[in-house]
């Protein structure tokens, strides 16, 4: 690959692909450079460290997930849209294990760039929930609950932590039904 064809975007996309393949903890600058057919020091023209790449992977993942979640909810509204977004989240996280690992330590209050990474997904959740006559305070609690469930469930699946032979899909479906029924109980409550 020609040296001048290396871009920040290509480095992050390559890092995402590699982290999904070998795991975020096994990702190295040497591995990324080899994949790009460049020498490791050349990466420093674009990034400052492996931690910098991991932070960019986190932002990349949240943005990509936001697009997929929004696409999943096109043409539906209310609880159907919420359900479709949850399935899109789950599908993304189990199919992008390395990127998801980077996304886990997201804190939107760390920087404006991080806050902007999730603006789409959290914005659409607000748009779905607010017409359901749910208070803005409860919407924030619901978003935390959804994030905790989706990230936690996906993390357990990705680490093969469900040893019971019952269907993981059935467990996910039932858990989501329980959460949605709980959300419905908050309609009209301050």
Model-predicted regions and their roles:
Residues 70-98, 136, 142-146:
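Hydrophobic alpha-helical connector segments
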Residues 102, 148-165, 180-189:
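Amphipathic C-terminal alpha-helical segment
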Residues 19, 53-61, 100-103, 107, ...:
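Alpha-helical DNA-contacting segments of helix-turn-helix folds
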Residues 90-112, 153-163:
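Amphipathic alpha-helical segments used for helix-helix packing
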Residues 11-19, 61, 65, 89, ...:
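Short hydrophobic clusters on alpha-helical segments that form packing/core surfaces
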Residues 59-84, 122-131:
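Amphipathic alpha-helical linker/stalk segments
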Residues 108-136, 140-144, 170-181:
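Amphipathic alpha-helical packing segments from all-alpha helical-bundle domains
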Residues 10, 14, 18-52, 56:
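Helix-turn-helix
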């Amino acid at each position: 690959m020609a040296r001048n064809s290396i871009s920040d975007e290509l480095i992050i996309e390559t890092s995402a692909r590699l982290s999904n393949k070998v795991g975020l903890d096994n990702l190295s600058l040497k591995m990324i450079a080899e994949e790009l057919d460049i020498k490791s020091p050349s990466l420093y023209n674009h990034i400052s460290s492996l931690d910098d790449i991991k932070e960019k992977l986190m932002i990349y993942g949240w943005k990509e997930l936001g697009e997929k979640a929004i696409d999943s909810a096109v043409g539906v509204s209310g609880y159907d849209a919420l359900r479709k977004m949850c399935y899109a989240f789950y599908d993304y996280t189990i199919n992008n294990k390395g990127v998801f690992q980077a996304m886990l330590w997201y804190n939107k209050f760390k920087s404006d760039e991080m806050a902007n990474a999730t603006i789409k997904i959290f914005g659409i959740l607000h748009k779905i929930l607010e017409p359901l006559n749910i208070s803005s305070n409860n919407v924030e609690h619901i978003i935390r609950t959804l994030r905790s469930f989706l990230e936690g469930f996906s993390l357990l699946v990705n680490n093969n932590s469900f040893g019971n032979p019952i269907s993981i899909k059935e467990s996910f479906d039932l858990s989501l039904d329980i959460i949605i029924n709980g959300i419905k109980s908050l309609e009209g409550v301050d």
